[in-house]
A protein has these predicted regions:
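Glycine/serine-rich phosphate-binding loop and adjoining beta1-alpha1 elements at the start
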Residues: 83-146
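A glycine-rich (often HGG/GG-containing) alpha/beta subdomain
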Residues: 1-109
Length: 147
């Protein structure tokens, strides 16, 4: 079981596409529940801001995990899977953990060093934790990021 991040940001996708994928708290909660019901995924947390949408999961199968996340995002947004794949980035295992640290430090923000993102990640974590969607792996990574 390894951490997997599937996402897009202002650096990889046009704002119009990010807006189509944007999720309010209710949609985020529902999406986390759908994700953790997939056999390949055991934990899920979604960071959704005006500049990024990132799905943090724990998977037992890299390719199946990525495919499951993409299918759920396409279903939620109505955006075709092939279109999504053109803008998504994927990070796995150590690279996923490093990405979370980079994001929470504000190093991947439109304005480098901005601190609003740490609160947004904290909110995403709290929402997912309240729904029982996070477990020991995401919890440990959030702790390492000092969120």
């Amino acid at each position: 079981m390894s951490m997997l991040v599937v996402g897009m940001s202002h650096q990889s996708a046009p704002v119009a596409l990010l807006e189509r994928l944007s999720m309010d708290d209710t949609v985020r909660n529902d999406t986390c529940e759908v994700l953790i019901q997939k056999p390949s995924l055991s934990e899920a947390m979604i960071v959704s801001t005006c500049n990024r949408l990132e799905v943090y999961t724990v998977t037992n199968s890299f390719h199946t995990g990525v495919q499951d996340v993409v299918k759920v995002l396409a279903s939620n947004s109505g955006v075709d899977e092939d279109e999504l794949r053109g803008y998504l980035y994927v990070r796995y295992a150590d690279a996923a953990a490093e990405h979370l640290l980079t994001v929470t430090a504000g190093l991947d923000s439109m304005v480098v060093g901005e601190q609003q993102i740490i609160g947004q990640v904290r909110t995403a974590y709290q929402l997912a934790a309240e729904r029982g969607a996070v477990g020991p792996r995401i919890h440990a990574q959030i702790g390492r990021a000092h969120v």
